[in-house]
UniProtKB/Swiss-Prot annotation:
Positions bound to Mg(2+): H370, D371
EC number(s) on file: 7.1.1.9
Crosslink position(s): 1'-histidyl-3'-tyrosine (His-Tyr): H242-Y246
Keyword Mitochondrion among UniProt keywords: yes
PANTHER family cross-referenced by the UniProt entry: CYTOCHROME C OXIDASE SUBUNIT 1
Organism from which the protein derives: Pecten maximus
Gene encoding the protein: COI
Protein name, per record: Cytochrome c oxidase subunit 1
Enzyme type, top EC level: translocase
Bilayer-crossing regions: 16-36, 64-84, 101-121, 149-171, 185-205, 236-256, 269-289, 309-329, 340-360, 382-402, 416-436, 455-475
């Protein structure tokens, strides 16, 4: 019991960070299995699952587990807790008990989200939970959607508490002689991420509370029959939802900078101050571009022009970061160890995802491509090959520091190449499916789309094998 009580009563930032990593990895495996179920359904025309409601429930659970229970806990909670105090020269976080609280709120949140999918047909709303029709009572009348909303509320409480802790630690624990500009880039990434979460999460909480009032207390915030407006929910959700995608990738930017500096054997990353201001710019611009998710809801031409222009503007600070990483690599004696491979893969595939993002930022093109597999391919290139690649780069790089053990270099490289080929084979064909007009979140399709869906399923099978190799690699270490 003594060994278990260490974890139940942990206040140390290292113990809490380890628990975040364990929860995140478990959720990542769960989310991957759900994606494999989706790919099996889409591997050939016709239905394999009992109904489309079950398929939509799988889509919803996959998205929420991957975003709120995998990428955020690992990048922000795991690496943040382990590295932030050490990079600032502190013995712990400013509020160790708040740190513990922010972790222990997450397992109940994950429990509510998972349980919701075993009630009725699950919550088939997608992670966006659009009301009228998807999450409205006539169409999602059971308790499953309510449990999903409560689970998201708990995840939001956890992230808010965590963000307060990180910001206070960043501002107060740092030595007064140690200027903020010279803080490591990962520290700055966490500071910007915490700011994004603190500003955007209350808006999501308000939107979800209004939604649950509509569902259970006869209000009509979003119901047109009672004078409400469903587009209001989209504005509230995407004001949170777009900063959220930067929350997922910014800590990864910081990790990539640190891993690159180590393996290029340079003193610092190229243009480190510009990199810092680029992250701040991305954070600020992230709050004023949410409308690009809503081009098809009836925004007027001037509004769509504004959101197109500002969305393209985000490519500037992002380009500063990408070219600074390339300049850091230039002229260095790069050792092709596993973390370096993950970083190089990240730079290539994140750039690819950014290019498709600029294409989708055009309102005239997005009207045609909205809710097709082109959008799925775009954000999976940014997340499945962006955020996840940074997680593996950081994890393999810092694993000896965390555990005093080493991964097998051969297995680590093999894991990278198998994953790299697998995710590309999974998501690259989806660009063609989207350009051909295949809609997302639909479990069946005409025979016309069979060829590229088959390749996509083969790629997903390769990713499943690579994850098995990762588990073996972990076990062997």
């Amino acid at each position: 019991m003594v060994r278990w009580s260490r974890w139940f009563m942990a206040n140390s930032h290292k113990d809490v960070g380890t628990m975040y990593l364990m929860l995140g990895m478990w959720s990542g495996f769960g989310g991957l299995n759900l994606s494999w179920m989706m790919r099996l359904e889409l591997s050939r025309p016709g239905m394999w699952l009992p109904s489309s409601e079950v398929y939509n429930g799988i889509v919803t659970l996959h998205a929420i587990m991957m975003i709120f229970s995998f990428v955020m806990p690992v990048l922000i909670g795991g690496f943040g807790n382990w590295l932030l105090p050490m990079m600032l020269g502190s013995i712990d976080m400013s509020f160790p008990r708040l740190n513990t609280f922010s972790f222990w709120v997450l397992p109940p949140a994950l429990y509510l989200v998972i349980v919701s999918c075993f009630i009725d047909y699950g919550s088939g709303t997608g992670w966006t939970m659009y009301p009228v029709p998807l999450s409205s009572t006539p169409y999602s009348g059971g308790i499953s959607t309510d449990l999903m909303i409560l689970g998201l509320h708990l995840a939001g409480i956890s992230s808010s508490a965590e963000s307060i802790n990180y910001l206070v630690t960043f501002l107060n624990v740092r030595s007064k002689s140690f200027k903020a500009e010279f803080s490591p880039l990962f520290v700055w990434a966490l500071a910007v991420t915490s700011f994004l979460l603190l500003v955007s999460l209350p808006v999501l909480a308000g939107g979800l509370t209004m939604l649950i009032m509509d569902r259970d207390f006869n209000c009509s915030f979003f119901d047109p029959s009672g004078g409400g407006d469903p587009v209001l929910f989209q504005h509230l959700f995407w004001f949170f939802g777009h900063p959220e995608v930067y929350v997922l990738i910014l800590p990864g930017f910081g990790l990539v900078s640190h891993v690159l500096v180590f393996y290029t054997k340079k003193l610092r990353v190229f243009g480190s101050v510009a990199m810092m201001y680029a992250m701040i710019s991305i954070g600020v611009l992230g709050f004023i571009v949410w409308g690009h998710h809503m081009y098809t809801v009836g925004l007027d031409v001037d509004t769509r022009f504004y959101f197109t222009a500002v969305t393209m503007l985000i490519a500037v600070p992002t380009g500063v970061k990408v070219f600074s990483w390339i300049a850091t690599i230039y002229g260095s004696y790069l050792s092709f160890e596993a973390p370096t491979l993950w970083v190089l893969g990240f730079i290539m595939k994140f750039t690819m995802g950014g290019i498709t993002g600029v294409i989708l930022s055009n309102a005239c093109l997005d009207v045609a491509l909205h809710d097709t597999y082109y959008v799925v391919a775009h954000f999976h290139y940014v997340l499945s090959m962006g955020a996840v690649f940074t997680i593996f780069a950081g994890y393999i790089h810092y694993f000896p520091f965390f555990t005093s053990k080493l991964f097998s270099p051969v297995l680590a490289r093999g894991h990278f190449f198998l994953t790299f080929v697998g995710v590309n084979l999974t998501f690259f064909p989806q660009h063609f499916l989207g350009l051909g007009g295949m809609p997302r979140r639909i479990p069946d399709y005409p025979i016309f789309y069979y060829y590229w869906n088959q390749w996509s399923t083969i790629g997903c099978a390769m990713v499943m094998v690579s994850v098995s190799l990762f588990i073996h690699m972990q076990w062997e270490a």
